[in-house]
Amino acid sequence: MSLDQNIAIKNKLNKNIIFYISIFIIGAVAYYLSIINEDPTVFPKSITDEFKFTAWINAGEDYLKDNYRWITRLFASFLQAGYMALENFFVESPWILIMSLMALPALAYGGIKLALFCMFTVYFWGAVDMWEVSMQTLALMGLSVILSVIFGVILGILSSQSDRFENFLKPILDTMQVMPAFVYLFPAMFFFGIGGAPAILATLIYAMPPIIRLTNLGIRQVSKETIESAESFGSNKFQLLFKIKIPMALPSIMMGVNQTIMMALALVVLATFI
């Protein structure tokens, strides 16, 4: 057995020992707390009274609102301006133009069946007298998806180029995906006000993780042989990324765009309430 293997085995044993000792200490402390408390079904108040987590969170929220609300409201004004411009365009445009904008890309990429479905959908919006609210939802959805794709692809590219950045981003993306929408929907409303801005921000948080993950995955899955061949012809890092890796990762990136659209659609209906 080599020296490296011995070191790896020792490191693994040390980690296991630390893990089991930690489990034992936590279990012993929990058992002690359950014994000293009169009611074993209630956590000891001697700890909860000292650890005023809710009060700390409320104090932090009040501090941020009092001192930094102007920053969030300034950012919200830019988002709101973009949303209102897109909404006004959709609402004031002829319905036949909106139908064409929906049907022509569908015809080009999905065929005649998808184009007919899009035309029927647009016609249905008008037939049930839901045209204006449909255009508002379409504007909110469109801006959210565009921003999600832009920032998601950028973060995915950065993540693919740095293992450290990827490890930093992973727990954040996991939190964004598993956290219920209401958890960040209402704080966004408090900081950014009522309107399109908090709805767009909440949709961004919910819809960005798939495009970030799949962009990162697609670039990292480009074969080493392809990269070595490009390097042998003198390609630098910039050329490798934008002329080799990203074009070859496009199927994965487009899958991320698909998932982002679905995630945004799932939340945009809820977000319209604010």
Say what each PLM segment does.
Residues 140-143, 147-160, 170-207:
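Generic hydrophobic transmembrane alpha-helix motif, especially the helices
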Residues 127-138, 152, 212-219:
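Juxtamembrane membrane-interface segments at transmembrane alpha-helix termini
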Residues 1-139:
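N-terminal, non-cleaved signal-anchor transmembrane helix
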Residues 179, 191-192, 204-208, 215-219, ...:
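Hydrophobic/aromatic residues within the transmembrane alpha-helices of Major Facilitator Superfamily
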Residues 80-91, 131-143, 166-169, 173-176, ...:
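Alpha-helical membrane-interface segments at transmembrane helix boundaries
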Residues 201, 205, 237-271:
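Transmembrane alpha-helices
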Residues 176-179, 219-223, 229-249:
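Short helix-to-coil transition segments within interhelical loops
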Residues 102-108, 118-132, 144-173:
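Transmembrane-helix boundary motif in ABC transporter permease subunits
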